[in-house]
Structure formats: structure tokens, C-alpha cells
Amino acid sequence: MAKKNKKDKEAKKARAELKNQKNQKKQEKKFQKNKNKSLNGEEDDESDQDLDEILSSFSKKQIELEHVDITSVEKPSCRTHPLMFANPQHNKHELFIFGGEFTDPETKLTHFYNDLYSYSIKNNSWKKYVSQNAPLPRSSAAVAVHPSGIALLHGGEFSSPKQSKFYHYSDTWLFDCVERKFTKLEFGGRDSSPSARSGHRIIAWKNYFILFGGFRDLGNGQTSYLNDLWCFDISTYKWTKLETNSKPDARSGHCFIPTDNSAILMGGYCKIIAKNNKNLMKGKILNDAWKLNLTPDPKKWQWEKLKNFKNQPSPRVGYSFNLWKQNKSVAFGGVYDLQETEESLESVFYNDLYMFHLELNKWSKLRIKPQRQTNSKNSPATSKRKSNKDQEKELQDLLNSILAKSNLNDDDDDNDDNSTTGPNSIDDDEDNEDDSDLDNQEDITISNQLPHPRFNAATCVVGDSLFIYSGVWELGEKDYPINSFYSIDLNKLDGVKVYWEDLSAIEEAKRLGDRDSDEDEFEYEDDEEDEDDGEEEQDAGPLEGDEDEESESDDDKQAQMEIPDERSWLPHPKPFETLRAFYLREGANFLTWSISNNRNLKGKQLKTKSFELCEDRWWERRDQVTLEEERLEDTGGIIERDTTTKPSKRR
């Protein structure tokens, strides 16, 4: 045993010596490289400029603009960490992208943006806005939109071209979604508004914008994570800092979503001192959940810690989280750091899609359904879609007759038979889409696969569609921006619309592999031995391969079980049945149930309640229906697919 220990020590000593030699060679190589730069006059480049000078130059150029410059463009330039948000105006079908950053892979210089883009979903067209009153260039800012048509922007970060110097903003801006105009808000003292930061989150609730968390750079490589809570009153245009008895730990990159009378906070990221090395700050991915109980008086707001939710995704950070409907949110992507040392970081990236039901406190994993094979305008599916109006009229006649028997018709129901509450709102735009709109979609392809794994994607929900723009993927120490744009119909889940996608750099990196990993082989070995000597490891999520094996075994187990039905008296969706088809089939039953439970309502209000109940039921049984769909696909069973919805184009 003693001989073995002695041999291990000698081997370890030899590896350490080899490591020192390699590090010395690296330092010599770096010194020679810097020396050559100095001799060639390259030492005084843009990266050494003072940040105040850079920002001052931007400001001067911006002031010279005499008017707003509006240009039609094919698409935004490639960038990461921008803001993307929907126009909150009803039926506007438009989204905005602001700011972001891009690091040139050849020069390694980083450029920050302050241009604004608008995207018309109906016309599939982009416009670029450049004006003198726009915020200075930045990335990783926070934004939220209010139903009144305004958006609130706060903070963000900026750096020198080689990212040797960083700057965090503390300014607050209002954006008018109608006029496409930014307005900077001024406040009194230093503590009258949130401090400079990035990585924070803002939500809108009633007449307030609510801000929590984030981080700021303190210089000398030090970072401060925040857990302060602020509210912005849109009636007074003032920030107020709120103090609570208990509150979540400081963090950035968290999820923050409003509900009717609360706000839900989940996850996030911070850095802590490593237990075995006080000089090393290790990243910590948080997996807790909190509820902020909201009242009309902000001074009475209080935090409440929540238990873990059912079917919760594995721990991760950098995943998007967007409010979809009043009681549902959707999450995409993210990253989990498996192992972090002073010189390396191993991570797993995700591209899964989840729905979180705010009332049930339950997660559901969403899956893309296989594409139908037809796209002809004269196909049976298209003919079936044309008869869909007849089905809707039959349903309306039936609903009105049920209301008439109970003497619950509105006075104007007879004149409004064609106004269907519910399913029309889902697909009317598609059924009424003219040929010119179809022509604008010619360059869009449909994929049966979710977008490539990534973190920090810019996302927003417009209507029932989730839009995904940009994102970051890593290999070794290199970041790869993903220049791409997608949308997913969250009701149908019948494919991913790919507007554009460039994965060439990522595919090349995967083909070549991480060259740095071969060079650092001995560092990894030493790090592993250090962990064996007693380092407490960070909780690790499953490796990608292990995760697949676990998910497969979990799926096998789920296939053998039934998910309990707490409201078995309500109709059950069929496999592969859309929400629209479910309502057309069972709308009368849902209306009857709504009448018995809403005695004070009439006519249209009862129709609205019946559709809301149908929608809740469709999502409530989504996990069970997904199991049934998977069983049918695995066994090759005959599937009754819904053909009332519009077939997707394949080009």
C-alpha cells in the first residue's frame, strides 16, 4: 500500500512539473506576443481608450442626427444579449429588438449597439430606427412592457472593445411603442432610482413596473450581486425602494413573472467563494422559488419562499421565461455548469421547451409534433379548413340554443352569431391570410426539431407564438453567437418556423473539437485529483448523454402509468387534438358546466368562461395526452390527426 501511495505521489509530482513547464511556455509565448505588438506600434489600440471618451464620442455622433432615420432592412445584424419585447397594443402583431453586442471572431473586438428594430409578423418585414434620443449602446439591460403601450428600460452594460474595462448603466428610459420614441427619465438624488447593474429583471403589474436583482462590476475583477426590490409608479414616474422582512438571495439571470396578485421568482446565478480556495469565486446556479405577494399598496409587499414545483426542469441559468397568457408562462434553453476550476468550465446547454402553469404551480414539457406532409392549397386538409367555418357556425348555433333555453342570451346575440369567443382568436388570422401574406412567408422553412441548444436567447411571446432570437453556445473558453430567428406556435406545436439560421461556426467548432482542451489535459487531471483530496463538489446536473438515458427510462416508466385526473367529469382531449378542435368538439359541454357555476353571467361572458375552462382543461391534461401520443407513435397505432388547422408550408 505504501509503495502504491509513493508511486501515486511521484506520478502526481511529475504531472505537476509538466504542468508548470507548460504554463511557463504559455507565459513566454504571451510575453513575446505582447513584445511584438509593442514593436509594431499596436500597443495603443482601441481597447486602451477610456470608457468615458468612447461614450462621449457616441453621444456627440448621436446629437448630430437631426431626425429619426428609418430604413427597411432584411434582418438585424448578428448580436447577443439584446432586448426583445412585443408591442403590447392589441392585435399589433409586432416586436422590437434593441441594443446588444457582437464580438468579431477575427479581431476579437466587441461592438455594442443602440439601434432599434421593429418586426412586422404579418408582413415578415424589418425596419431599423436610428435617432438622437436613443439610449447609449448597451447589452444585458432589462425591459418590461405595459398594456398602455409603453416599455420601461433600465441599466445594461458596456465595455471597451477588448472588454478589459466595463461600465454599468443606471439610467431609466421610457419607450413609446406607438411613436417609436425613447424618453430619458431624470431623478433627484443618488438613491432615488436603482443603482447601475445588468442581469436584472423587470415586470409590469397593474400601474407598476417591478425590478429585482442583477449584478454590477466593482473593478479589480470583483462583482457584486444584488437582491434589492424597486417599484416604478407609471402615474408619478418615480422609483421607490421597498424593504421586506425576508427576501431571496442576491442573484442575476433569474426568472420573474407576474400573476394576478403576485409575482413568481425562480432560479438565477451568483458567485460564491470556493470552500477549498478563498481566492477562487465559483459560480452557483440557484434553483429556489419565491412569491412576492402584491397589494395596491407597495409598502405592504412581502416575499414568501415556495416549495419546488412539480415536474420542474433540471437546474439551469440563462433560460428565457415569458408570460404567455394570464396564467401560463413558457421557458426555453439555458445552461448548467457541471465543473468549474480556475482555468476551465464544463457546461451542458439545453434547447428544451417548458410551460409553467401559474395557478397549478406545475411544469409541463412541450414537444414539437411531426409535420404533416401536404402543403397544397387544394389538399384535403385545406378543403377541411374551408369547412371549418361551417363547424364554428354549427357550434355557435348550439351554444346560442343552450343559452336561449336557460334565458341567458344577450340582447344582441342574434345579431352577433358569427362572433365566436375563443377558437376564432386562435386561428382567424391564418384563415383570413391572403395570398400576399403567403408570399411574404416564402423564405420561411419548417423544422421538426427545436432550435440548437443555447443560453441567453432573446425571446418574447406575441399572441400565441414564441419568438426566439440569437443566443450563445460555448465550446471550451470560446463563445459562439447564434445568428438565428425562429417562432413556435404554442397552441399547435406543429413545427418550428426558421426565418434564418447560421450554425456554420458551431458545426465547424464541433468538427474540430476544443483545441484548448487537449492543451489543458494535465490541468483537468490535477483538478480532478484536487477534488478527490476533499473538495466539496458543486451539485451537478446530468450530463447530456446521461440525461438522455434517464429521460428515456423516465419515459418508459411514465408510459406504464396514468396521470391522476382531478376533474374527471370534464371532457378529455384526444391525442394530437388542437385546442381549437377540442373546443369545437366539446364547447357545448363546457358551456353547460359554465352556466351551472356562473349564475350571474349571461351570453358572451358565459361563452368566454366556457372557452377559458376548455383551455385550462386542455393544458391540465397535456402531460397525459402527450403520453398517449407517444404510445401511439411507438406502437404505430392509427392516429386521428386534426386536419382543421392550416398545414405548414415546406420549401
Swiss-Prot record:
GO cellular component: cytoplasm
The keyword Cell inner membrane is assigned to this record: no
Pfam name, any one: Kelch_3
The keyword Repeat is assigned to this record: yes
Name of the protein: Kelch repeat-containing protein 3
Organism: Saccharomyces cerevisiae (strain ATCC 204508 / S288c) (Baker's yeast)
InterPro entries with a match to the protein in the record: DUF4110, Kelch-typ_b-propeller, Kelch_2, Kelch_domain_protein
Further remarks about this protein from its record: Present with 4010 molecules/cell in log phase SD medium.
Entry keywords, A to Z: Kelch repeat, Phosphoprotein, Repeat
Region (Disordered): 1-50, 369-392, 406-440, 511-572
Residue ranges with Acidic residues bias: 41-50, 426-440, 516-555
PTM-bearing positions, type Phosphoserine: 47
